[in-house]
Amino acid sequence: MLENLVESLRNAPVVKKGDYDYFVHGISDGIPALNPCVLKEISEVLAERIDLDKVDKIVGVEAMGIHIATALSLETGLPLLVIRKREYGLEGEHEILKHTGYATSKLYINDLNEGDNIVLVDDVVSTGGTLSVVINELKAIGVNILDTFVVVEKGEGKKIVEDKTGENIVTLVKLDVVDGKVVADSLI
């Protein structure tokens, strides 16, 4: 069902960032060029799993959750919202400090309110740093997270997020880097 995605991940180059094995893929990095068949395959699989009548917005996390959320928004006809890396100073803006395996930065949530029903999407869960703080802040705001979808699960990131947030995370592909090569298998 996710043959194009899995095959493209298995062919992804791997680079070392300190002690961190980082795979480079169009879904997670925007390079190499992402075959639109892969993005379409992802959006179709995700759209099949959403109860469209209950969702107010598709929410993606900048940067690499944007194209996934956009494709899903186009596939479902649901409005798109992006959790940004830039502060706007709008009324009701929420700032989040996030720590990942390779960086510390801030994210900003706007235009989400108590009672909003959302589907949250992102590209990769690896250390759980981004997704954990985003989910916990959304819950603190009172947003109802109906589903959380992540395209790639690397290492123990999914379990870390589930333990820290109490939310169920649905991942499409389980990936690891073994001896400098990507090993990937579909979970759907």
UniProtKB/Swiss-Prot annotation:
A cellular component term, taken from the record's GO annotations: cytoplasm
SUPFAM superfamilies linked: PRTase-like
Entry's Gene Ontology BP terms: IMP salvage; purine ribonucleoside salvage
InterPro entries according to UniProt: HGPRTase-like, PRibTrfase_dom, PRTase-like, Pur/Pyrimidine_PRTase
Pathway: Purine metabolism; IMP biosynthesis via salvage pathway; IMP from hypoxanthine: step 1/1
UniProt keywords, alphabetically: Cytoplasm, Glycosyltransferase, Purine salvage, Transferase
PROSITE patterns (UniProt xref): PUR_PYR_PR_TRANSFER (PS00103)
Subcellular location: Cytoplasm
Keyword Cell membrane: no
Gene Ontology molecular function: any one: guanine phosphoribosyltransferase activity
EC number: 2.4.2.8
Catalytic reaction list: IMP + diphosphate = hypoxanthine + 5-phospho-alpha-D-ribose 1-diphosphate; GMP + diphosphate = guanine + 5-phospho-alpha-D-ribose 1-diphosphate
Signal peptide: none
Assembly description: Homodimer.
HAMAP family in UniProt: Hypx_phosphoribosyltr (MF_01467)
Family, as annotated: Belongs to the purine/pyrimidine phosphoribosyltransferase family. Archaeal HPRT subfamily.
Function: Catalyzes a salvage reaction resulting in the formation of IMP that is energically less costly than de novo synthesis.
Name assigned to this protein: Hypoxanthine/guanine phosphoribosyltransferase
